Design a protein with these regions (language model features):
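Alpha/beta enzyme core
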Residues: 13-14, 18-82, 87-173
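N-terminal basic/disordered segments at the start of proteins
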Residues: 1-13
């Protein structure tokens, strides 16, 4: 638990206000309008002093010199089909917790889907990643997306972040 606590303290501000910038969209969305040079964009983001950034492993590795010691790094370890695919594919594991730790990550981010076709497999992935995170002292952050649900209630997502949840998530978006 010591590793998780140390890493969580780097991610979360003590004043209760935390800014996390997501920059992991390129893996599935391709080039994003307004972001022509990811390195320059990251330099600008880091200069703004957010608490953490969410990045894909390759971006972390290529930009370690501008990230290290300046911002908490959250590594996206699941991914889906790209926007170029004819059919959406639910997230799969694309790298390991061990690899994320080896490149300096303070936490890992996984996507979860509830209320639709991707629910069972995504919850299984979150559970397996949660176990690995517990073994390695790595915080798990889950992004939960409701699918095919007729409610806008946050209750299904919130229930997965309850203390004692089998998902072991430290944060949920």
């Amino acid at each position: 638990m010591t590793g998780k606590l140390i890493r969580m303290n780097r991610i979360l501000e003590t004043d209760g206000k935390t800014v996390i910038v997501a920059m992991d969209h390129g893996q599935f969305q391709g080039p994003i309008e307004g972001i022509k040079n990811i390195r320059k964009t990251l330099e600008n983001i880091v200069a703004g002093e957010p608490d953490a950034v969410i990045l894909n492993p390759g971006v972390i590795e290529k930009n370690a010199d501008i990230l290290g010691g300046k911002v908490s790094i959250l590594c996206r370890i699941t991914g889906a089909s790209t926007n170029y695919s004819a059919m959406f594919d639910y997230h799969r594991i694309t790298t390991t917790v061990e690899h994320a730790a080896s490149i300096g990550s303070d936490g890992v981010v996984v996507m979860g889907f509830i209320g639709g076709n991707g629910e069972n497999s995504s919850l299984e992935i979150i559970g397996r990643i949660g176990e690995e995170c517990s073994k390695r002292g790595m915080p798990l952050i889950t992004e939960m997306l409701p699918q095919a649900m007729e409610t806008t209630s946050p209750t299904p997502s919130i229930s997965l972040s309850e203390p004692g949840s089998p998902m072991n998530s430290e944060l949920i978006f």
